[in-house]
Amino acid sequence: MAAPGTVASVMASKTKTKKKHFVVQKVKLFRASDPLLSVLMWGVNHSINELSHVQIPVMLMPDDFKAYSKIKVDNHLFNKENMPSHFKFKEYCPMVFRNLRERFGIDDQDFQNSLTRSAPLANDSQARSGARFHTSYDKRYIIKTITSEDVAEMHNILKKYHQFIVECHGNTLLPQFLGMYRLTVDGVEIYMIVTRNVFSHRLSVYRKYDLKGSTVAREASDKEKAKELPTFKDNDFINDGQKIHIDENNKRMFLEKLKKDVEFLAQLKLMDYSLLVGIHDVERAEQEEVECEENDGEDEGESDGTHPIGTPPDSPGNTLNSSLPLAPGEFDPAIDVYGIKSHESAPRKEVYFMAIIDILTHYDAKKKAAHAAKTVKHGAGAEISTVNPEQYSKRFLDFIANILT
């Protein structure tokens, strides 16, 4: 029986002919409650399989930063319970993102497994922009919906971002961009980007902050506070009397890294980014584990094995190799790359997970207008968030340096 199409993808820059390729579904099933997630799982699986046949180049070429692979799928009646009948999947700059994954120490096979073995899990977090978040089932990666403007901005900065990652050997607090995709289902286009989770894949976070170094309108709303794991902000952090208790060596290394990252963002005229902070309380987690085990004893067979506290949106989660027994408060730094333990004399034994998020806001005319309007409303000296990129970076660094103790 002749196959109606061939499995192929176009890895070519936009200057080349855009050929559409039609594929037949293979027997691997991608079950997800949301058809878009099924398409994402299918697409990532297809993309990694295709890339495995493409030789790794000695160096990336300028065209790699404009390239894409694009595929159209006609499902007909196969697996129609799980997949839409017709969809398109586009991956941007596949060779560049493969190179970035390698530089961040992420194996493509592991990446593929994390995103396709089981459906990503929805987070209750929603950005002000309306972006939705999902976490890979093993909590290692975050999938975020983005706008076409974000895709354009990623293309604008990708070459410089890649160069920066090469120069710092992947040792950065910037988001680790691992793949960018466009999914088309029923004529609707959705853009998604995958990053490494900031938070731990196994240590639960009980308190979460999004810090910008600004104090105007920087409190969590009542609606946000009602969530299981709210995202608190700068004024909440100050009012809680919160501090990050890390030793001098960790503090020095963290601030050096942060300074380089933020200077890079200022050069690119990027702003409005945040430091995402997640706090794991070691004693609290131990206590909850004891209670969990006691409950498991009473309700044997009913537990789903999940932690009582969920993992926040912009972070990592349950791993493929979690078989290694780790002591309370311990983590694998190869996976939980952002983790820092509290110092010996800290009031509580904690682990902090901290990294920069949301870097794709460019200081353009819209931001300048917002700055002017807020200055009129709050006064020139107010700590508003829409200052220029140089001011933003300085204020951000000063604020973060002051909360480390």
Curated annotation (Swiss-Prot):
Q: Name one Pfam family in it.
A: PIP5K
Q: How is it modified after translation?
A: Phosphorylated in tyrosines. Phosphorylation is induced by light and increases kinase activity.
Composition bias type Acidic residues, residue spans? 288-303
UniProt region (Disordered), positions on chain: 287-326
The reply to whether Zinc figures as a keyword in the UniProt entry is no
Highest taxon in the source lineage? Eukaryota
Location in the cell reads:
Cell membrane; Nucleus; Lysosome; Cytoplasm
* All residue ranges annotated as the PIPK domain in the record: 32-404
Biological process terms in GO annotation: 1-phosphatidyl-1D-myo-inositol 4,5-bisphosphate biosynthetic process; autophagosome-lysosome fusion; phosphatidylinositol phosphate biosynthetic process; regulation of autophagy; vesicle-mediated cholesterol transport
Keywords on this record? Answer: ATP-binding, Cell membrane, Cytoplasm, Kinase, Lipid metabolism, Lysosome, Membrane, Nucleotide-binding, Nucleus, Transferase
Q: Which SMART domains match?
A: PIPKc (SM00330)
Q: Which CDD domains match?
A: PIPKc_PIP5K2A
- Key word ATP-binding present: yes
Query: What is stated about the way this protein's activity is regulated?
Result: In rod outer segments, activated by light.
Q: Which GO terms describe its molecular function?
A: 1-phosphatidylinositol-4-phosphate 5-kinase activity; 1-phosphatidylinositol-5-phosphate 4-kinase activity; ATP binding; protein homodimerization activity
> Which cellular components does GO assign to this protein?
cytosol; lysosome; nucleus; plasma membrane
Q: What is its EC number?
A: 2.7.1.149
Reactions catalysed, semicolon-separated, are: a 1,2-diacyl-sn-glycero-3-phospho-(1D-myo-inositol-5-phosphate) + ATP = a 1,2-diacyl-sn-glycero-3-phospho-(1D-myo-inositol-4,5-bisphosphate) + ADP + H(+); 1,2-dihexadecanoyl-sn-glycero-3-phospho-(1D-myo-inositol-5-phosphate) + ATP = 1,2-dihexadecanoyl-sn-glycero-3-phospho-(1D-myo-inositol-4,5-bisphosphate) + ADP + H(+); 1,2-dihexadecanoyl-sn-glycero-3-phospho-(1D-myo-inositol-5-phosphate) + GTP = 1,2-dihexadecanoyl-sn-glycero-3-phospho-(1D-myo-inositol-4,5-bisphosphate) + GDP + H(+)
What function does this protein fulfil?
Catalyzes the phosphorylation of phosphatidylinositol 5-phosphate (PtdIns5P) on the fourth hydroxyl of the myo-inositol ring, to form phosphatidylinositol 4,5-bisphosphate (PtdIns(4,5)P2). Has both ATP- and GTP-dependent kinase activities.
- The protein's assembly and partners: Homodimer.
Protein known as: Phosphatidylinositol 5-phosphate 4-kinase type-2 alpha
